[in-house]
Amino acid sequence: MNMKLTIVTPEKRILVGQEVDEVTVPAFKGELNILPGHAPLITTLETGVMKWKLKGKEKQDLAVISWGYCQVSPEGVNILANIADLPEEIDLQATKEFLALSEKKIMNELITDEDWAEFQRDWAHARAKIEAAEQQPAKK
């Protein structure tokens, strides 16, 4: 049974109709692993690292996604994400610096509920980017 994966954001297409053996997404209630023949569903996605294995490959590919939707149908999996970053697009040092500055700022300032919610989103996205970048093999 074949399963195709498409990942799109408002700015770019990461994958379009690529055959995959497995997809794992950060769903609303935890990690969701999707294999060929999975029951149809639509779910919201949280910020985190999604993974997939292209058909016949051993290595998992990954991307950091920030909020979106996942649709599973008999034809495959469609990911509509607000943001999707591939590991090679991530500046690990800049992300770590951003995270440190954000954490320092949040500890030293009074903030509104809205600012707190924004901090939580940004923090989760930065942590996921660091996780993805650190999982990627070093480039030669």
Curated annotation (Swiss-Prot):
NCBIfam families: ATP_synt_epsi. SUPFAM superfamilies: Epsilon subunit of F1F0-ATP synthase N-terminal domain (SSF51344). Keywords: ATP synthesis, Cell inner membrane, Cell membrane, CF(1), Hydrogen ion transport, Ion transport, Membrane, Transport. PANTHER family: ATP SYNTHASE DELTA/EPSILON CHAIN, ATP SYNTHASE EPSILON CHAIN, CHLOROPLASTIC. It is found in: Cell inner membrane. InterPro entries: ATP_synth_F1_dsu/esu, ATP_synth_F1_dsu/esu_N, ATPsynth_dsu/esu_N. HAMAP family: ATP_synth_epsil_bac. The lineage of its organism: Bacteria, Pseudomonadati, Bdellovibrionota, Bdellovibrionia, Bdellovibrionales. GO terms for cellular component: plasma membrane; proton-transporting ATP synthase complex. This is ATP synthase epsilon chain. F-type ATPases have 2 components, CF(1) - the catalytic core - and CF(0) - the membrane proton channel. CF(1) has five subunits: alpha(3), beta(3), gamma(1), delta(1), epsilon(1). CF(0) has three main subunits: a, b and c. Produces ATP from ADP in the presence of a proton gradient across the membrane. GO terms for molecular function: ATP binding; proton-transporting ATP synthase activity, rotational mechanism. The gene is atpC. It comes from Bdellovibrio bacteriovorus (strain ATCC 15356 / DSM 50701 / NCIMB 9529 / HD100). Belongs to the ATPase epsilon chain family. It is a peripheral membrane protein.
